[in-house]
Amino acid sequence: MKPVKTIAMVYRETGTCGGIQRGASFQVGQFGEWGFEPVVLSESDLGRGPGRREKLAAAIRGRGVDLVIEHDAYAEEKLSADIAATRDAGVPIIVFWHSVFSWMVANGSRNAGAIFDLLRRADAIIALTSADETFFRMIGCRSLAIPYCDADLMEGFERGGYPHRVLWMGRFVGLKRPLDAIKTVERLRETVRDAELVMLGDGAAGSRAALEKYVRSRPGLRGAVRFEGFRKDVRPYLESAGAGLVTSKFEGFSHATVEMKMASLPVVAYSMPYVETLAEGTGAFQVPQGDVDAAAARLAALFSDPAECARQGALARRSYEAIRSFDQRGAYGRLFADLEKPRSASSLTAPDASRVRLVAETLLEHAGMGLDASAERISRKLSGGGLLAALRRLSRWWR
């Protein structure tokens, strides 16, 4: 393998992939600062159907690319074409896995096995947590955990207090469970009368309207929930909040959690023990998945003790500073150097034995989520009349 100078990054279209777009954009600037030459390729350059393989291989040769980093690893056809293209062009490919390792399992995705088989063919996987790193090594991949290192949005800010304002940030989609955030604050207001919720984000047409309808139907929530939509500048909302809330089914890294920690906010989150930013002693508290009562109780306990809020906020800020101090450049240098070795001689293939149990438990939990997700899809099809309508059409044709 020749020395890495020009790096091509493959990702989805701008504005369609949330954290993936954000991570890829950050990486472009990062590599540029380090003296590499980044080349950005998206679907507008490569397409997503026949011909993608040839287009990527031609771009690699034409632009003198030494290494490809794949940020769009979740569609079987595209990932297969991109791996094949790098083989055609004779350069290594690293897959940047932005999600938790069992994201596809938790979603009930039927092509999860095919994606994992393709990942084994990649030269390496960049993971976001040690649990993800361990999983990919368990299935035979060369992998290294390199967490995001978001810029400090709160530089110069000194927190003066912890108002009873809960901040939730994310997309209005099922896996983020925005309705659970509203229900949590509804319970919280039974003991903390002036508690309120600020929601930053948006979603598909009708998703916000459904949430607003729920709020209007609950007298106890009048004036207590603010829908602020998507905001690029989140600092004012971080400054004015007193605690963060994360109600996700699963996360790969959770930018929202890190931003809350930048602002010295304690964070209450649904249990995701594989996410290191939610570890005990880092200003974060995990409660059982889907348990809005437990989330409300934890927020109430924090708000009832301003000194504890301040202590946990300080831990949260230190947790962010620890992430920020991670040696990103050294980690990438180690990964690039390891690519020069055969996989059998790699130092990045042995799983961390201390995390194997956590990986196994997470896979089992997420397999259960996947079964539930598949059952919900089948139920929606039946209740929506898709199968029944087809049977009726067939019956009419037969008669």
Predicted regions and their residues:
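Glycosyltransferase donor-sugar binding loop
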Residues: S42-D45, M169, E196-A210
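A charged, aromatic-enriched C-terminal amphipathic alpha-helix characteristic of glycosyltransferases
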Residues: G19, A307-E361
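Aromatic "clamp/platform" in nucleotide-sugar-dependent glycosyltransferases that forms part
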Residues: F230, K249
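Nucleotide-activated donor-binding/catalytic signature segment of Leloir-type glycosyltransferases, i.e.
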Residues: A210-G229
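Conserved acidic donor-binding segment of nucleotide-sugar-dependent glycosyltransferases
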Residues: A284-V292, A301-P306
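Conserved donor-binding/catalytic core segment of Leloir-type glycosyltransferases
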Residues: E158-K176, I182-V185, V198
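A conserved mid-protein helix/loop that constitutes part of the nucleotide-sugar donor-binding site
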Residues: Q21-F26, V173-E190, A210, D293
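Short hydrophobic beta-strand element within catalytic cores of glycosyltransferases
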Residues: P266-A269, E276
